Amino acid sequence: MNYAVKWEWNRHCDQSAGQKVKSGAPISSLSPYCPQLFAELTCSLQIGLQSADPAVAGGVGRTFDREDFRRKVMLLNDSGATFGFDLIYGLPDDTLARFREGLNFALSLYPNHLDIFPLAVLPGTAVGNKAASIGLQHLPEPPYTLQQSPSFPLADMAVARRLGAASDIFYSRGKAVAWFNGVARGLKLQPVELLEHFGDWLLAKQGRQCDEAEFDDAAIWQLQRAFLTQLFTERKLQKLLPAALDCVDYHYAYGVALMAVPPIPPDDEQLLQLDLLKMKLVRASSLTLLPFHYEILDILESGEPDLPWIAKHLKQSGSWAAIYPAHGEVCTESLIRPYYRLLEGLDGKQPSGQVAAKLKVPADDALELLQFALAEGMVTGW
């Protein structure tokens, strides 16, 4: 097997701070020590899977051992490394059924993202040289995209294109890796079927094929919520919906916090000198406040989402959480509702003590919360 891994990280040194560094190697060369190294770096690996079908891979001069590939990828998963797959549809002898099955396999390995695109029949390559003889019809000019083939007709290419767009929007841009397979199991669907349902739903909703560049992250989050609400309802699985939405909501907020730059908090000495109740504090832009159906910490502690288990064993007691970056990681604080509402009310327009008084939060309690929130970078304005 020779499926190349490409990686990129930010290299920090005196003369090249922030420089992007790219390199690559066959995935077969990954030792048990490499994944942990990748996990410790600011590094994203892109694995050129191309096709998960051994016969299709063999047609372009590759060998593919699924179990060996799975073992190597699980090393990456176990280490916490960030990685994605490149998948191509329309290779010689590829079919829509084979592509769907390969996508299902790829999703089962929990990649952080998937890049899916049609075959480019490049001149001078092995595939390009035999394209005419095996019936590959493609654009005559760059990017030489395959239009159809004997095994992958035009209509099937359109279906694969819609699947690729659904994956881009719902899975990759939607940062769904942590909950996607668990939600699919809760719906009693194969992962690829969940994407197909989303692609069909989005086409009906928008009236046309959409591209992920049309949506910002917040819009994709709302699309995920609306789609899943409808699908769980249609499949008469409403009792599992609250747990599914809690997972979707949390990981959206986690993704926001992961990319956010927190404010610089005061040091301990400065903090003690501030009269916080008289200050017009404001929520930091890096803070996300969200309500949940369940105690969100219980869901996080339960591991990969098992929606039936959550619905059966956990109580929908409700929780209110602050999700934010601090100390080089994403932090999650489960708050009592008055504290949540106090943070929610900090808009920088009125003294924080007035906000607390309106919510009937005792001044001493409010001060303790605000000191913690300011030290953690949840609020700013000092």
Q: Which residues fall in each region the model found?
A:
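Conserved non-cysteine loop/helix-boundary elements of the Radical SAM core domain that shape
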Residues: 1-141, 146-152
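C-terminal accessory regions of radical SAM enzymes
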Residues: 132-259
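Long, charge-rich, low-complexity alpha-helical segments
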Residues: 241-267, 331-382
